[in-house]
Amino acid sequence: MGDVYVTSPTFVGHDTGSILAIDCHPSGKKFITCGQKARTSNGLVVVWNAEPVLDKKKASNENVPKLLFQVESQSQSNSCRWSPDGKRFAFGSDDSSVSVWEYVGLINSMGSITGGAQNVERYKECCVLRGHSMEVLTVEWSPNGKYLASGSIDYRIIIYNARKLPDRITVLNDIQLPVKGLSWDPIGKYLASLEGDKKLRFWATDSWQCVKSVTEPFESNIEETMLTRLDWSPDGKYLMTPAAVRSGKPLIKLIQRQTWKSDQFLAGHHKGTTCVRAMPRLIEANLKNGKRMQLTCAAVGSRDKSISIWVFPGTLKPLFVINNIFNHTVMDFAWCGRNLLACSQDGTVKVIHLSESVIGEMISNEAMSDLCYQIYSIRPPRYELTDKEEDESQDSFNLSDLSSSANNASFVTCPEDVLIKRKKLVAAQQSSDIQLTKSMEDNSKENESKNSEKTMMEERNKQIDVRKDGKRRIQPVFCGTTTADPMTSLSSEGKKTVAPPPAKRKALAPAVPAKKGEVDLEDSSDSDDDDEEEEEDMEISDIESVRNKKRKVPATTSQPMLALDLKKPALRPMEPKSLKTQEGTVLMEAPEQQPKLSQHVVDRKGMFVEIDNRWKHGGVETTQIKLIKKKQQTAENEDDMMDGERRVNHECLWMAVLGSPVIIVAANKHNVVLGCGDKCLRVYRTFCGTHIVSLRLDSLPVLIGVTEHAAYALTENGRLSTWNLKLGKAVVTRQPLFDCVEASTDNSLISADVSETGVPLIVFSNGSIFTFNVSLSCWIQAITTNVLGRLTSPISDAQLSCSNGTTNSAGPLVRLLKRMRKQATAPGVAPQVVKAVKESQLEQLLHCAEQLGNPQDYQTMLMLYVETLCEGGSEKKLKNILNDLSRSGAPMQVCGLRRSALYDDVTRMIKLKQPAIAARIVAGVAASTTTKSLF
């Protein structure tokens, strides 16, 4: 046991008050405790520096702070937890409230809020949640940071919207006992709750319904605990719940996921178990037979004042047990890497240091992400942190870098977070530049004032004149003030003419490919004559407006360009839509009706569709639709401008009024598509606002989109329809998504789009890509990320770009393949297996590209397929491609590309890669074509 030792940081405590909960910051640099202050009924929450606790040398260093922040509450605090991004923490108290605090930076002056200790960090109370009527016993953040759950003695669980506190998502009321413990599934599908040590419930996060209740392990439990801490295994396969009893012996029950079996357990303590906490990631252990196995390492605490460390499955005894480590009940655990922090009701904290030789090697975040993806087709956000970033987050504690470390510890789960983070970074840089400029000006003024004062004092010393008889005579000397006269300063400044600084202009960026999460199909079809005329009219109006602005702007003033007129806004990727399978159908949730909506018109700069669902006119409340264009309004002279600001004028191009609300909008340069609350899809001409058609759907629309003259709609019943608005015909009619969904696995819809011809392209969270064969009237699976992906080499981005040259010319299928996560080839796979699987995948992708009709996608897939066949020496398949491209009676073009040109490209590559094969098959194909043409 030399590799395991226990330390007792004496400086960590609540002045002999009880410590009821402990949690480690995601960065591993600090941890938080909560409980009761000594000899009072007040609560105490303290943020501690983790390095003095984990390192003895830094514990003795006086320059290393130990207490970072503390706050005293009016009542006892029972539970505290950090948010996944590490920027906030929440704690629940006996006064029925949940308090949320946010990190705002470091402080210079030493002090604390309602306390006497010295704080190093500054936190502000951003929200107090008062939804409960009795004591709050547990609080937990969801792994993705989207929800905050709290459980109370009032028999209720409240789910809050963590991104918009204090907004509630739902209240779970169907509970008969106090809620003593909560735990979120790391995959994000379930919330587990333990009620009065008598019943365990599993709540589905997509419907907030109880999907399973477990009571058998707790039927004979008569020794209830004050607080209960349950936890999931890192891979989400097991829920570890304390307070279970079997044959009168206390134990930890392991509830298996999906099957909900509870036949496995961890036993050995003499009194009731109170808490359990698993290591953040699985460990790899060497078995006696030489094999390596991935196991869960967990700590168990009990009322017998002891701690046991377990690895499972496959073990019957704990790895080791530390008896009587505390003087009272073990209340909670927190893992900081391989170090276990434990707190007790006796008011102390113990640290158990575990070496790799004892518990095994902890696997990487990337390996955990791949493991969860193989099991659930989902990559949890908590495992998306790379090993390099994790190592950086575990670096030594530095006060100057504390703020940045908190920011770096956060993860991004949605595009809105990316935009907010970028805005904050730009604002921080601008504020730092302004502060630096001001400080330099202040320093220069201060130095100038000091020099003037020094000169004045020297002149005053010269006033005293000592005569020969010893008498002193003071001579008058003029002494001016050390600061300039305000009137003089103003007048002097008024005479100077200061040239305004040159305006900063944003450069016109070239067209960029679709960003992560987008399925933006390329514009490859030609427009009609009327479309060209309307585009020309809009361009002329833009040119005239620019000319008018140039006339009004003085030549000596440099005007900044409006950002709306400079660049096309990037499309935001859609949020994943959860799919619920029920009785052979897929059910989805339509977006909530909003009072107002705004949607940018694709390929139209500064043009937006504005929706007002509560527009009142003549005493009637209806829905107003307006197409507006935002223009820059420039003042004719500088006196009309305030602080150099430029006003934006909204020009209404057309307006329409509807009797039903609009819940979702999509628009491009041709059509405006509105998904309405009366189950209709209404289409308007973008140019003039003419109502084209109103299409009746089978249920409310969940997703809609438009690409060129093609539109699609996905409804609540999971049925997809697409239309070619240019030809006025349906392409796909109410086709169910259930045929594409695997009901046995957790799945969600990542993206959906439609090609210019009306062929859909949908992507699921398990990596599967589907399109629709209109001729065969059936879904076609283009690619799937399953076990076959481990049997072949992945398609690299370089291979996908070599045919097109640049990313800008890539089609929607190629862009999707570039964004997909590449799977590593399993070791020991035979070359012939790699070749067979690779060719089969490319054949599927080639067929998908042909159905979509995009020329860039088809050419890329064709040339990549030919290159792969040349590398494998597949002579018969190469000959089949040439026969297909040169067969008589076939259309002259495929996906808008001439067959003869494709034939020449394929022939050229075969001659380059396999000259011998080219000499045999090219001549044979040419002879066959000549023979067929004679008849």
Curated annotation (Swiss-Prot):
The keyword Transcription regulation applies. It is found in: Nucleus. This is Protein HIRA. Residues 431-556 are annotated as: Disordered. Residues 439-468 have a biased composition (Basic and acidic residues). It comes from Caenorhabditis elegans. Required for replication-independent chromatin assembly and for the periodic repression of histone gene transcription during the cell cycle. Keywords: Chromatin regulator, Nucleus, Repeat, Repressor, Transcription, Transcription regulation, WD repeat. Gene3D superfamilies: YVTN repeat-like/Quinoprotein amine dehydrogenase. PANTHER family: MEMBER OF THE HIR1 FAMILY OF WD-REPEAT PROTEINS (PTHR13831), PROTEIN HIRA (PTHR13831:SF0). Residues 520-542 have a biased composition (Acidic residues). One of its GO terms (cellular component) is chromatin.
